[in-house]
Amino acid sequence: VHLTDAEKNLVSGLWGKVNADAVGAEALGRLLVVTPWTQRFFEHFGDLSSASAVMNNPQVKAHGKKVIHSFADGLKHLDNLKGAFSSLSELHCDKLHVDPENFKLLGNMIIIVLSHDLGKDFTPSAQSAFHKVVAGVANALAHKYH
């Protein structure tokens, strides 16, 4: 993914304003609610029977935190996302057999949560930059599938 220096600065500056743990928990929760077929990867998380159950599930929140911290680590390697996510790509491809389309879906949820949390700071320029980032991360995570 190619981001200009201005876009990189915008992304890193805005990322410093968010509660990453909350973003991760909400984004994963929204993914599981809006696209319920993704729940099959998380059946061991217990009660996912309703939107409320998903959004309040401690295992969903904990995994969302783990996911978003990996995403945040990737923000430090915007010029080499494939390298940064190589081992996670291999894990999700070879062991977990996650449909790579799910990475795009989760990226969309991250954008939605960021938009809500950042409000007017999430300008069209910021949204564009974050869309590039989540697309790059999704592509990097899908890399081992090819």
From Swiss-Prot:
Positions carrying S-nitrosocysteine: C93
Gene Ontology MF term list: haptoglobin binding; heme binding; hemoglobin alpha binding; metal ion binding; organic acid binding; oxygen binding; oxygen carrier activity; peroxidase activity
GO biological process: hydrogen peroxide catabolic process
Record-listed N-acetylvaline modification sites: V1
N6-acetyllysine modified-residue sites: K82, K144
Tissue: Red blood cells.
Pfam families the record matches: Globin (PF00042)
InterPro entries: Globin (IPR000971), Globin-like_sf (IPR009050), Globin/Proto (IPR012292), Hemoglobin_b (IPR002337), Hemoglobin_oxygen_transport (IPR050056)
Annotated positions binding heme b: H63, H92
Cross-referenced SUPFAM superfamilies: Globin-like
Domain of life the protein comes from: Eukaryota
Job description of the protein: Involved in oxygen transport from the lung to the various peripheral tissues.
UniProt cross-references to PANTHER family, sorted A to Z: HEMOGLOBIN FAMILY MEMBER (PTHR11442), HEMOGLOBIN SUBUNIT BETA (PTHR11442:SF42)
Protein name (Swiss-Prot/TrEMBL): Hemoglobin subunit beta
Lineage: Eukaryota, Metazoa, Chordata, Craniata, Vertebrata
